[in-house]
Amino acid sequence: MAYRKLGRTSAHRKAMLRNLTTDLIVNEKIVTTETRAKEVRKFVEKMITLGKKGDLASRRRAAAFVMNVVADVKEENDDVVVQSALQKLFDDLAPRFAERNGGYTRILKMSERRGDAAKMVVLELVD
């Protein structure tokens, strides 16, 4: 499978893609460059597909890639419920995209970045 090097070493590239994938799962929208967005989209599509499968092997594969960060904090009665990015993927996003066969993300173009004129885009999850 071909991939973009993005001007980084393999470890740096993998860390950046993991971070962007996790950020998109948590926030459901990120602003980044066009080439990064096109590369991150591949990983997000795979993670949501794993979430739709929902078995133990899929959970372990997703847990190995998605960062362990807090996605949401809710207060119910006197309890504080903390939801991780992985829980959000399997509990919220997977049921939302259950009827959709791929194409979970959308790329919207923005104006160029002021400093270096890089093409900027908004990468978001489709409703």
UniProtKB/Swiss-Prot annotation:
Swiss-Prot/TrEMBL keywords: Ribonucleoprotein, Ribosomal protein
GO cellular component, one term: cytosolic large ribosomal subunit
Alphabetized GO MF terms: structural constituent of ribosome
GO biological process assignments: translation
Superkingdom: Bacteria
InterPro entries for this protein: Ribosomal_bL17, Ribosomal_bL17_CS, Ribosomal_bL17_sf
Family of this protein: Belongs to the bacterial ribosomal protein bL17 family.
Complex and partners: Part of the 50S ribosomal subunit. Contacts protein L32.
Protein name: Large ribosomal subunit protein bL17
Organism, scientific name: Ligilactobacillus salivarius (strain UCC118) (Lactobacillus salivarius)
